């Protein structure tokens, strides 16, 4: 288990972040590329968390999830906040997230796979991603845990390989 945390090192005001990565499959292996706010605890304190990509075990898809106070505590049913997206197993893929004034868009290999709308501007916890809030990148690989289950030693070693991380400022006039 290990990773790289960008907290207090480099933070980004949202636009688009792409990460070119590949990972091995193994029972109990959980690679994750995600974003947390530089200035607060996420996601139940009103801040957000953007899971750019997570992979579990031998799943033929990746998980892309958006967490907020709203999706975790207020409305867990009516506003879907996640997608299971296809990817090219065993190859480098580009996983991305774009934050716009009115939506968050997830991409795999530059193809949109999910969009989360800003539905209620009057509810701060529903869409805490847009504006001047800065997020930092976490690149992590975990062995074991409640979501992935126990590790099967015969499947190891397993690795997460990151080729690059690119960050783009928002170019639209929002």
Regions found by a protein language model. Give the residues of each.
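GH16 jelly-roll
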Residues: 1-174
